[in-house]
């Protein structure tokens, strides 16, 4: 009975999500040719205002990682999980400068993605194609993260009636169908519903769990300090190696990487003007306050459901939810967590499709005028590959996140420095501009 109620609530909200995505695209003109259709599908026609950009980019911070991965690392290690709050807040500060710059460059030259910018900046279409291939490889673990997270949610709220393998497939099918038909605009609309549910459910759990299990925060924190003090300092619980040096370097690198993440850039390019991005850079850090909730509740689960190991720790928060709440409430919280997978996963798959449609497949003459259709096919292929990885190479959610960020960091010099430093040339060309010749190499001796 509980499984029926929870999955029914979940099913109704998923149907509403798809309907909302379709409604968002109704009446939107394709523009001139398929390229116009690609711009509308991939960057929302560059017409999204402050509210939509805010909820869309906030979706980057509130994924299934927030509900499951942050709670899991809070359960396993404790304090090191705070790197998430650190790098995102610093990333928003950097984005205050970088976001408007990327938006202006793309707007001026009619570009729709990070690979477009690289190809245009260095005048090498093949370089844009190479970046598209590399970025796809780097982003697949993050798509896998969202499939894993949503699959865990679906299986858990069904009280085990739906196996994890089927739950992973449901996550893939719902998100792939959603992104193919709705594009970035649909993701922005659904982000509004997601954010309302995230704020409401996390706000409720922040008060309910400590009261229900510990009679309030006072007794809970007393037990945490007395019995689990190791979780409150670096390097956290166990021999994790996640000390202060790891925290500082990871936070710094991720804060730089997040501003050139293809999905972040998609949010930048969807804005109707640069001021929208500056306002969002100031407002978004306040949203990070909610991230402390799953981290704390993950540590609360240490006393309620001890003994979770490996990937099982991702279930720490939902173990508390299923154990203490009625089925309809489990369904609603499951919907919030699922939407926290769907929105970012949709944007990731959308970006992968756009990169290939614009920078790789467009190099094939027959496909040049069919970029949007080609991009949608790539979305399905990329989602299928991520689903295959989920079945064959499972991992904890935080590890998958770190893999993607560490890999994307390799593109930082090309993307960020290439746009900020106009004299930077491909491969540090042998013949720099004459006014800078002495800075690049010493003068040759006469022979």
Q: Predicted segment positions?
A:
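Helix-loop-helix module between adjacent transmembrane segments
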Residues: 82-180, 250-254, 337-347
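Membrane-interface helix-loop-helix modules in multi-pass membrane proteins
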Residues: 39-110, 243-249, 253-257, 264-309, ...
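Selective recognition of specific alpha-helical transmembrane segments in multi-pass small-molecule
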Residues: 11, 16, 130-145, 178, ...
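Hydrophobic alpha-helical segments and their helix-loop junctions in multi-pass secondary transporters
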Residues: 16, 20-31, 99, 139-147, ...
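Hydrophobic, small-residue-rich membrane helices and short re-entrant helix-turn-helix hairpins
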Residues: 110-119, 182-193, 260-292, 313-316, ...
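C-terminal membrane-solvent junction of multi-pass transporters and transport-like membrane proteins
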Residues: 30-51, 403-447
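Membrane-interface "cap" regions at the ends of multi-pass membrane proteins
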Residues: 1-68, 179-182, 201-207, 214, ...
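Loop-to-transmembrane helix boundary motifs in multi-pass membrane proteins
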Residues: 121-129, 136, 354-395
